[in-house]
UniProtKB/Swiss-Prot annotation:
HAMAP family: ATP_synth_A_arch. Belongs to the ATPase alpha/beta chains family. The lineage of its organism: Bacteria, Bacillati, Bacillota, Bacilli, Lactobacillales. One of its GO terms (biological process) is proton motive force-driven plasma membrane ATP synthesis. InterPro entries: ATP-synt_VA_C (IPR055190), ATP-synth_a_Xtn (IPR031686), ATP_synth_asu-like_sf (IPR023366), ATPase_a/bsu_AS (IPR020003), ATPase_F1/V1/A1_a/bsu_N (IPR004100), ATPase_F1/V1/A1_a/bsu_N_sf (IPR036121), ATPase_F1/V1/A1_a/bsu_nucl-bd (IPR000194), ATPase_F1/V1_b/a_C (IPR024034). The keyword Ion transport applies. This is V-type ATP synthase alpha chain. It is an enzyme of class 7 (translocase). Pfam families: ATP-synt_ab, ATP-synt_ab_N, ATP-synt_ab_Xtn, ATP-synt_VA_C.
Amino acid sequence: MNQGKIITVSGPLVVASGMQEANIQDICRVGHLGLVGEIIEMRRDQASIQVYEETSGIGPGEPVVTTGCPLSVELGPGLISEMFDGIQRPLDRFQKATDSDFLIRGVAIPSLDRKAKWAFIPKLSVGQEVVAGDILGTVQETAVIEHRIMVPYKVSGTLVAIHAGDFTVTDTVYEIKKEDGSIYQGSLMQTWPVRQSRPVAQKLIPVEPLVTGQRVIDTFFPVTKGGAAAVPGPFGAGKTVVQHQIAKFANVDIVIYVGCGERGNEMTDVLNEFPELIDPNTGQSIMERTVLIANTSNMPVAAREASIYTGITIAEYFRDMGYSVAIMADSTSRWAEALREMSGRLQEMPGDEGYPAYLGSRIAEYYERAGRVRTLGSQEREGTITAIGAVSPPGGDISEPVTQNTLRIVKVFWGLDAPLAQRRHFPAINWLTSYSLYQDDVGSYIDRKQQSNWSNKVTRAMAILQREASLEEIVRLVGLDSLSEQDRLTMAVARQIREDYLQQNAFDSVDTFTSFPKQEAMLTNILTFNEEASKALSLGAYFNEIMEGTAQVRDRIARSKFIPEENLEQIKGLTQKVTKEIHHVLAKGGI
């Protein structure tokens, strides 16, 4: 422990002297109030400290005490359904302890409740050899999540004691005799430094798709479990709603939602909506699998920088248990702005648009912690982290540094488009500019699992949309009537795909989520219409005849998005009806 004194205060940056025995990334208690800070730069005996609480009223001469520990999170039962701030302070217990709706400075509250008792059920017995990552036992944390208590990193040996029963997170639950003869006493809780990724046995290639229930994503721009995706877009394009939809309906075990520097009302929406929503996979409330980290725009700027790391470390902990985890960061641009502010106060040489030169490496550091892995331990298990980051480029300009550095790392780009949002086409993901480098892997995975021709259908649908884009300029110049019959059909089918398939109402109880079988049935109907109508045109039918003769079935295709999942056969039955009506048009020989 080292004690120094403050010599300079500049917003969230405090410089202290007499810190020659301190280390970089040490946590400090700053001033008489004991504010939480982290050393980010050392020069001789002077330490630059970024303070995670409001520094007004702090002055030169006040003491700074180091703890000798890096910024760490507590990992154990009690994380699920909890809401933390950027440095893992539990906001509900913080409010009860301080009787204030605002963050009172200098208050230290443990992240995990020290009084709550958890029923521990051992899975191993005394005398067994254990290594780091082995599951010792379980705690039923919520109705959905079984919390698996693991042997901490760098601990291995013989299990000499393990107890069943109700324990707090600090009670000794098991004892391991290490190779050197010392006894390690373990509890339900472990700590981990947030800036250090948790070790794994092996990194694997992600192949299984993350089903989000959003048709434009699952069909055209899928992300895998263990993948990384970016959602850039201007203000009002729907980034937060896309993130909320994935957090609600993604087929993962755990969701970590990090509200980083965004509006407080958005976190309020999450708190109001999530407890009422039922997870379609488990039938329980979505909050039963969610961890919230709220670091809104009016909270100290330095804590934004920590909140992303806090979230990904908690995600890694659940991944190590063998769960699939999705982490949403909304928004990484606010995190980058916090880096820029601290870099400016440190008087570092600025890079593009004032961001620090190390912006790219910090963004890469975060996204590289996602992935599909084989975890540590003698028991074979896999876990995944899917990282989805919203990016808020000023004015929607995706050439700015945060977006460009993000796109260099992630494999999925869901580009939100202001013109689409203004036309009230939501989700406003532009199908011409977005991309997914997982498309081929996901397509072959689905074809193999479902025994269907899914990837071919997706390719055909995208070809129709791209053909429409090339025809639009001709239509604007000389009108729709100047097109050939086949091109007019292409324009009509493309409109069907856009309006009846890609458009999705997040606030409709049925349309908000579409399962994969329903997506396939809906897309098959539209493509069947295109195929049968093309055949009819080649046999001499007119475009107008086909459109008038199939008006009823096309209307039913348009309404199929509002048919509940349990009535899926109704949607599948439309395929035969499409063929029948077009054959009827041909049989009549004109209308």
